[in-house]
Amino acid sequence: MTRKIFITICLVTLFSVIASAGDNNSNTPLRFSKEGKFKIVQFTDVHWIAGNPASDIAGERMNEVLDAENPDLVIYTGDLVFGAPAKEGYMKALEPVLKRKLPFAVTFGNHDDESGMSREELLALLKSLPGNLSTSTAGLSGVPHYALTIA
């Protein structure tokens, strides 16, 4: 009887892992090219401030990088926006990827939720945008918290 319980637990665990992996970005558009290549552009600590001319310059640089690199994925790693209004800042900071219809993912830094929106509200905003791959996985702490699969 102990062996049956052990096998049952193993099977339930295996199927749970498979199911949870399938739930997270199961319709991901991330694929290696036929040549086996996948290009990622990373922007970090953009500190976008809505209405600040320096932020407009940062937007120009992001456009230049995206035009030059033509990435398969863009990742923003923390402190994308610095200062309220957060929604306006996020929409302007993400404009380069949104207008190109590129898939993107965001992780939050220590300043992102200091702009008048909580991390949960920011994630809800991101989830409403086309191309966003940011999400949170049930049962894991942190917002957002996820893994992306490249096939």
Predicted feature descriptions by range:
Residues 15-16, 57, 91, 124:
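Hydrophobic alpha-helical membrane context
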Residues 21-96:
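N-terminal active-site segment of His-dependent metallophosphoesterases
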